[in-house]
Amino acid sequence: MTEQSSKSHPSFMSTEYSLPVFSSQYSDIENKDVLKSNSWDPYAANAPIALSEIPSSSKSGKTNGSKAAVESGLASGAFGNRTGNMNRNTSMSGYTFGSSNFVPYNLLSNTPSFTTSHSSSTTFVPPATMGGGLNNLSSPSSSLYLPGSASYQRSNSKNSSASILQMNTTLDDIPILLRRPGLSSYTPGPSTSRRSISSSSNLGGNPGLIANNPSASKNFAFTSGSSSTNNSTTSSSSMANGLQSISKHSAAFPLLSNATSFFGENLTPSLAASTASTGSTDSSGSNIANTLIAPTPTISPPSANTVGNPSPADTPGFNVPSLISDDPSVSSSLSSSVASLSLQNSNILSFCKDQHGCRYLQRLLEKKNQSHIDAVFAETHPYLAVLMVDAFGNYLCQKLFEHASEAQRSTFIQIIAPKLVPISFNMHGTRALQKIIDLVSSPDQISCIVNALRPNVVLLTKDLNGNHVIQKCLNKFSQEDCQFIFDAICEDPLDVSTHRHGCCVVQRCFDHASPAQIEQLVEHIVPHALTLVQDAFGNYVLQYVLELNNPNHTEAIISYFLYKVRALSTQKFSSNVMEKCIFFAPAAIKEKLISELMDEKHLPKLLRDSFANYVIQTALDNASVKQRAELVERIKPLIPSIKNTPCGRRILSKLERRHPSSKEKPIVYSNSERVNTSSSA
């Protein structure tokens, strides 16, 4: 016995070898510890361990081989199957269970392959049925069975996953799964976790019990196993009841709500429910009263009419849709298969919301096969409004609308029209809707969108996500089609213009407006000029109007500021507008504005003000020659009092550059003054 085998090891079916659950409820250290759990030591027990009765992990962690009396069983793991008694094969190709084998799936093959079945004295493992699929995972060495409605949960954990689509198993998990042969599927549990599989402890009170193959109810005939241990009379009955319960809720993944597969024949994206039923086969209580019965799969050779892969009716297992071939002959056959099938109820919705399922359907649509497009549209159109706001589903909606026909696009828009406003508010929905607006072309489609958005334009303009939808309409629709936006803003211009997002929409309105629409906006905005100029966001709207450099608009705005220039120049937001007024104002009005700033009583205060000094600088740059000279003469006497202030230094710097004659050596920073100042200090 090696030193390693003498150490304490948990039972290979204990919860310590279940798939680790990565959850926010666990710390990073705890998650890492899950990955660092000891590798399974097949030599920890002298006697072989039967699959029929395996005790839960004890304090020592060792399994009790003496109590394992049932000779055989079958367990389905997430990445391979095992049968019979378990020993470790020295090769890296797999595990040996008594006279049977556990062979990991070949996850690196790009094309389906079919391997010889591995059999033992008591059980038979069917060949693989896995297509190219979502991640090009293909060719398992033995069938994979996953229950659609059953959850995968870690024992004694509150976290579970109600759908295999939420499992998110990646290639990083494969080494962990291969060293944890105690994986199998059980009855449903609460749905909270994103990733979980475990050895459950709620079947017949035996935490080590390996569940019946989930697909047995559809494809397997039950056979009697060997005699059980001393207490098998009482425990086997309850365990058998557990198996029966599983078979009622089990089928090949993924399943519809009625327990039928929605991956279609030929391993193509069936977008469709399989017509085969997954009802329970004969497994009466009399057959399993005193023994743990292992399912024996029955398998038929692949049908001759299949394209590259056997149909689900031929081979039980987990059918992942393979990628559509570029070969026209193959594509035509596949498309006919896809078109004849249909998805139902919530399973297609879950599939579209899944990252990998969504990507698969997008790749399917990119093939531009009209049969595939029609099938996807037919099955997803009842859920378009829901998918539009989903983190992954919105990408499918964008791709579907891109490849849909004009009739389908019109139907698409009519379906989502009642929910267009809440879709616009959503961070995912706004992107999908903007893509749709980019692609719409017919007047009916545009009219449908306009009518859906019209009642809530103001709310949309002020929303973080909704304002982008309005801006996209302005950018893509004609000026006539966008008139509803201008009308809505003009009803309450102050509310929109003083909003963080609304002010941006108003500026885009000016960018895309016709001359008549610009006049309409200015007519409704200018009366609120005095309020807007002092607002943190409204001042940008006024600046945008002034930058249009229309004398009529500029005069209309400045008329509200005359005799208030000094007060507005000392405010943070309005001072920016005062600078624009001086810059764009006609000569006569510009002179009036600067005259207010030159008042000898208020000029010293303006020169020292942190905002007004910028307005004075703009006045020096834009005043007429006569008015500039007058302003400089009024500033000169104030130089000694402002020279040491930050604002005053900026004014003096501008005077030195533009008006060297105003420089006074004793006052401005001359070399002699710097020497005198340093010596006095």
Swiss-Prot record:
Residues 656-666 have a biased composition (Basic and acidic residues). Residues 669-681 have a biased composition (Polar residues). One of its GO terms (cellular component) is cytoplasm. Gene3D superfamilies: Leucine-rich Repeat Variant. GO terms for molecular function: mRNA binding. GO terms for biological process: nuclear-transcribed mRNA catabolic process, deadenylation-dependent decay; post-transcriptional regulation of gene expression. The keyword Repeat applies. Residues 187-210, 273-286 have a biased composition (Low complexity). The keyword Zinc does not apply. CDD domains: Pumilio. It comes from the Eukaryota. Residues 319-659 form the PUM-HD domain. Keywords: Repeat. Pumilio repeats lie at residues 342-378, 379-414, 415-451, 452-487, 488-523, 524-559, 560-595, 596-633. Residues 180-210, 273-322, 656-681 are annotated as: Disordered. InterPro entries: ARM-like, ARM-type_fold, PUM-HD, Pumilio_RNA-bd, Pumilio_RNA-bd_rpt. This is Pumilio domain-containing protein C6G9.14. It comes from Schizosaccharomyces pombe (strain 972 / ATCC 24843).
